[in-house]
Amino acid sequence: MRATSRNFRLAVISLTSKIKKDMKNRIDIRHLIGLAFLSLLPLNSRGQVSLTLDEVIRLSQDSAITAFQSQYEYQSRQASYEAFEAMRKPQLSLKVVPNYSRIVSDPTRDYVYLRNFDIFSTSAQLRLTQKVLPFGGEAYVGSQAIWSEFFREEASGHPRQFVASPLLVGYSHSLLGYNPFRWEKKVEDQRLKAARCQHEYDLRLLAEEAATRYFSLACRQRVLQMRLEELLLNDTLLAIAREKATIAIVTLAELHSIEVQQQNAANLLEVARQDELKARTELASLLRLKQLPADLSLLTIPDIPPSVSYTTEEVVRLALSNSPAYQHQLAELTEARHQEYKARKERGMNVGIDVNLGMQQVSNTFGSAFKNQQLYALGSVQFSIPLMDHGAARKRHEKATAWTDRQELASQEVERLLAEDAAVTLQKLQSSRNRLTSTQKTIQLAEETYNETAVNYANGLCDINTFTLAESRWATAYTNYLAALEEFWVSHYHLQTLINYE
């Protein structure tokens, strides 16, 4: 990292805080310090590697592992939803079942039909099914053929048999009054919405993390630059003081004071270097780079955007609608209500139906089986009454009810935490904006004070402690400004993550 002169530092301050003013001319001390810094001015930035905030965000979203994980997770959920929607459409299936059976009877009995024989049969069924979405049952239409071959030594009847059903239509419903399709649709829609929110949120979260690390490095660069200037300034002051001490212009106490100040500046510079190196490493890690270029130029800080016009209520509402955690919790709550409703229906008497009608004929040849078809109608009603289940059905319902209550409380807790986070972030954003304005004014005042003190010190109107105190106050004001600047941008991008605003 190359050192910079106070003129360059003031240019940086003017760039970041938009403070534009002309420096006052400094007398003797200006010439001494200026000569010391002249050889340390930075080279032209041409040839340095630059990096902007938009580039960092784009690189993080293109290269971060979490971005790929989020993309694949969303694709998986989307494919699952499309499969779910496909299963709600008409399904055409062909089912072929070969079967072999051997009947072994008592050989001592004199009944022919009880003697040993083998049966080989094959059934083929073509069926078109459709879920009846408004009611919860399933309707079907199809065609069926069965071929049976009998192998026996002594048998009456035909050794071969064909059963043909060219048309059959039916409807079945395992639990009347319960429509699982309506609940499944609600749950799957909510899960897809939650997955979409999760993917968008993950990308915004990556942008927030990238911005946080970008501004952390930008501020650490400027702190390092400031600490380097402080050390160079104190080195120059110490050299001047030692020359003056030889002719008894500076007391020994003042000389020791400058030496302490120089050591403090060296220690602060080392801390700033470690902080800047840490910020570099964190940003490079996010971008999946081994390290950032050594000749990386000073990161630019964008202009402060206009203030947001959202109220706290609007921010909370937008945060809820864009939060994947809340949307996932709503999906879990919907599924819990589904299971509670099903358990309540199964608690009492369960009624199921299966009705079908069609045409059917039996013959010993395949062709004749399709002739002289007979119309048939079959229907069954199934009643299931738990006469003695030791309270199992009731306990299942109580379990489902308790879980639903738990999910409702969990949804309320997620909503509370989101509302708290959104409200606090909005307050921090507004507070940091006010702090930025205040610290900009403080920097300007501290700079004016420093210039005046430098003139007084050069003219012998104040001691070195007063001059270094003015320098320290300027450094404190600049550090406070950078802290407010970093907090503002972190809050800005966190609010953008929460409510998805541009």
Short names for language-model regions:
Residues 58-68, 75-91, 125-161, 169-187, ...:
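A glycine-/polar-enriched beta->alpha junction
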Residues 69-84, 202, 206-228, 238, ...:
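Amphipathic alpha-helical coiled-coil segments
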Residues 272, 324, 484:
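Metallo-beta-lactamase
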